[in-house]
Amino acid sequence: MKLLLSCISTKHSMLKKHWTQTSQDISCPLTVLGSHQKPKEDLGGLLCLIEDMGSTQKTLELKMAAGMVTSDNGVFVTSFSGVHEVDTNLGIVRHNIVSSPLFNALHSISRTQRGYLVASTGLDLLLEFNRSGEILWSWWATDHGFELTPDGQPRVLDKLADHRSIQYGTRAQTTHINSAAELPDGRFLASLFHQGMVIAIDRETGEWQPVLEGLDHPHAVRVLDARHFTVADTVRGRALLVTINKLGAQVEADIDTGTNWLQDCRYDSDRNCWILVDGKNSRVVLRHGRSGNKKLAEFNFDPEWRLYETHVL
């Protein structure tokens, strides 16, 4: 198996210092509710290519590397305000292949039938775009019932401003929407960090309905097929395989990953294994089968790396 691992920061201790100074809980790699302001220092970031079951690793510095998806010429990688493209050997980097004034704190990215879908998390916004940067579809959480921050403050956004250099703290956001993926029927699934749920969004109307509730600050929604998706119940450390239909969703498999910050999870059906990103302990764990009851491998990394997600090459 050949994996790419993204690290949104390579200065984890600096982040913890920032959270301490702003009276935040540092028991997890991210604060449970987040902070009002982002640190002003350069937080670094990188990609790590993992081969030969972890025995071979290659790194490439890339600031605030986060979401990854297969592109026409390699892999698209999101950063704070742009989408870069790397080849699968990390030999070539094309910076800012796509950038938009509406890109702010980009998180996960996925393919759609028409292009790509990215979570512009800092703006509580989903954007679908093509390779030329044309915006094909957008969904603002603040226009669809999510007007208030966790502190009860109304959020008003200037949709015509250039947000690429503005820092919005997690608690200044109403949802901290951090991942989204398209279902074969055209609806979009999205994970809402603050609300603890996965929702399904109608492309035409923008109307949404809850699909899975009661999660603890979820991440990493991925669609497997017309009937299944996966999501990380982050603080509980649970990787969930979920069956979905028009009426709702039901958890089919629930894997306890032994962490209190599961940053990312994906089920690789071709290899019949889970790939789990433990942000608390800076490790990636492979587990066999849908039930994940057998550990196949564990890769440990520098504690200064704040791991984000993996991409299977």
Give a label for each model feature:
Residues 66-68, 108, 179, 220, ...:
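Conserved beta-strand position repeated once per blade in WD40 beta-propeller domains
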